[in-house]
Amino acid sequence: MSNMEKHLFNLKFAAKELNRNSKRCDKEEKAEKAKIKKAIQKGNMEVARIHAENAIRQKNQAINFLRMSARVDAVAARVQTAVTMGKVTKSMAGVVKSMDATLKSMNLEKISALMDKFEHQFETLDVQTQQMENTMSNTTTLTTPQNQVDMLLQEMADEAGLDLNMELPQGQTGSVGTSVASAEQDELSQRLARLRDQV
């Protein structure tokens, strides 16, 4: 196994680890929700509010870990393509060497900065075989068409007998807390869309 393949393995491992962290935060969110119910039943609204804040924080953290997992996974796919095509540049190899400690830290800010460096390397990467790139992007596209995502979400909601309410205008989501959370999510979604456009 070459050094580059080891680093590629570490990238894929980090994506899985981030995904595990996301699931852990999901569990924490559920635990906090259970505590909210207990506190409300006891009439202790102050404690309930603290658990509600914790639940929202865990939910946002779960989403952040999941987004970063997807981003690292996408970069791993790009590195795999570069390795396969023999197009790993010296500067890209340098970025890859510096990543091991960053990925182990599970620090989202540091990992995000590292992914920025990777994405910059791919922007400057001169792809020799455009036809191969086109073929690969058709089979393993990194950017998912939004309408397909929406259709799948709707399909899953229909199967579960739920109403997605995707057409609801912002601000009609109910309480102030949820509209703030949705505003944060909208901002994250916009940032992710901008990142996709850069890739």
From Swiss-Prot:
Coarsely, its chief localization is cytoplasm
Q: Where is this region: Disordered?
A: 167-199
Keyword Coiled coil appears in the UniProt entry: yes
- Report quaternary structure and partners: Probable peripherally associated component of the endosomal sorting required for transport complex III (ESCRT-III).
Q: Which PANTHER family match?
A: CHARGED MULTIVESICULAR BODY PROTEIN
What family does the Swiss-Prot or TrEMBL record give for this protein? Belongs to the SNF7 family.
Q: What is this protein called?
A: Charged multivesicular body protein 1b
Give the originating organism. Answer: Gallus gallus
